[in-house]
Amino acid sequence: MSAHLQWMVVRNCSSFLIKRNKQTYSTEPNNLKARNSFRYNGLIHRKTVGVEPAADGKGVVVVMKRRSGQRKPATSYVRTTINKNARATLSSIRHMIRKNKYRPDLRMAAIRRASAILRSQKPVMVKRKPSRPTKSS
């Protein structure tokens, strides 16, 4: 079934849809912007890209759909864990999408999602206020 036909079926009735604030969002896997649109839908396309946080809380997992084996959903996804510093991680994602000519329209969205995940994994430094001297009278 073509992606356009699947989109016509799925766009208004899906278990992943969330409608609030006069907008429609989607919680499906591999939807980089969580938007209910044809481009970012993670279910209907033959090639999809997803970025998730790694299980151990350090790094990201890039999920890509294989071109071959579309009829076998259990083996149709390739998961690559990237556990480097932020610049190298974003560069790796950029190269995975650009060098393989794999959905270049999703490159910037994947980089932004990975950047947000990496930023959330950074430890928060607590700023201590300098203690005020006590008044001596």
From Swiss-Prot:
| PANTHER family reported in the protein's UniProt record | 60S RIBOSOMAL PROTEIN L28 (PTHR10544)
Q: Which gene encodes it?
A: RPL28
Stored InterPro entries: Ribosomal_eL28, Ribosomal_eL28/Mak16
- What's its job? Component of the large ribosomal subunit. The ribosome is a large ribonucleoprotein complex responsible for the synthesis of proteins in the cell.
Q: What's the source species for this entry?
A: Bos taurus (Bovine)
Please state what the protein is called.
Large ribosomal subunit protein eL28
Location(s) in or outside the cell: Cytoplasm
Q: Which classification does the entry list for the species?
A: Eukaryota, Metazoa, Chordata, Craniata, Vertebrata
Subunit and interaction comment: Component of the large ribosomal subunit.
Residues with the modification N-acetylserine, per the entry, are 2
Q: Which UniProt keywords apply?
A: Acetylation, Cytoplasm, Isopeptide bond, Phosphoprotein, Ribonucleoprotein, Ribosomal protein, Ubl conjugation
Family label: Belongs to the eukaryotic ribosomal protein eL28 family.
Instruction: Please tell me which positions the record assigns to the cross-link Glycyl lysine isopeptide (Lys-Gly) (interchain with G-Cter in SUMO2).
Output: 58, 65
Q: Which GO terms describe its biological process?
A: translation
Report the superkingdom from the record.
Answer: Eukaryota
GO CC terms: cytosolic large ribosomal subunit
Identify a single GO molecular function assigned to this protein: structural constituent of ribosome
Which residues get modified to Phosphoserine? Answer: 115
